[in-house]
Structure formats: structure tokens, C-alpha cells
Amino acid sequence: MSPICAICGQGIAPADDSKEHILPNAIGGRRTVNNFLHGDCNNRAGQTWDAELEKQLRPLALHIGIKRQSGKTSRMKVTTTANEDFLLDVGGQLEMVRPVVTPTLLRNDERIDVTAGSLTQARETLKGLKRKYPKVDIEAMLARAESRRSYATGAINIDLSFGGPLSGRSVVKSALALAHYAGLPIEQCGDAVSYLRKTDAEPC
């Protein structure tokens, strides 16, 4: 008897099988199971249910530095109580959303001051400035760059709540995948299976 897909309820042929992370890779999951989801069902759930869960948990994943098995957690824009905009990066680090370019007209020439969140951002900014100011020597300016550490003036307010029909199904799918990994037939988990297969099912 062929295994049954937890989402669509159809048999899984060897060619249609897929590796499913018990916890989504996007939030640091490593262990996988087979004979649990069709490849198509796996992809659809990943693009909807798991994507929503990752979006809701991204602030926490960035703050504590979750390492994915593959890929990298995307930075996210945050605003402080002082209305400062930053990008939250891995480990809770903050980076400027956009660089600040300040041209100053001197007696014989024009001076350009660039404040950027990283050397990479500074380099990209200087490349853009070179189109307007061809005499800009990117490498010379980077060699004279000064590194300074500064802190946000305001506090960052991050919503760590999660739930809803999409991320909720991702959580239930993980619980069902763990049961499958432990050798429990998924059809014995009636409420969980019903929740994954029926859009109007009651949350379990």
C-alpha cells in the first residue's frame, strides 16, 4: 500500500515523493521526512503556509540568529519609537535603510560626505555618485572611510504574535510530520488531517 499525502489525501508514488522538513527550513528546521507529502503539495504549502509562519517569526529568527539549512533569513524594515527606519539583520544588528549623502560646496570644489550602514552599501552609493561626479575615486574614498558604531535613539517595537489560518496550518503540518516520523499513521490524527485538507475545517 502506497503512503498517503497528508494534504491532498492521494497516494504518493515514488516519483511524486518529496522531502518535507518537520520544522520549516525557513525557521531553522533540519530533520526531514519522506512519504508524507507530494512534491506539488509540499511546494504549495511552502509558498503559503510556511511563508506566512516565517514572516511572522522573522523578527525572532533575526534577533536570535537562526541559521537555516539552506538560504538566509531576509532582513526586515523596522521603525523605532523615534521614527528612525532601520533594517534588522541577523543577530539583532541594525543597518541604515538608505545612505545619507551630503554635498558641501567649498571655495574651489564640492565635497561629498556619505554615511552608510556598511562598506557594501557605501560602495554601491559611490558607484551611483560616480555617474554624476566622474572624478569620484571609489577606492580612495573607501580607503579613507571611518567606521563608527552608533545606536538607535528610540526603541524598536516588534510584534511576536503568530497564528491564523495559514501559519496555523504550517504548525499543524509540523506536528503531523513529527507524528509520521515517529511511526504513527497520520490517519489516526483525524482533526489535524482534516484541518490540512479542508479550507473550512475548525482549527485543531
Region spans (language model):
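Alpha-helical structural context detector biased toward long hydrophobic helices
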Residues: 2-3, 12, 26-204
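Short, extreme N-terminal leader segments that mark the start of a protein/domain
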Residues: 2-7, 22
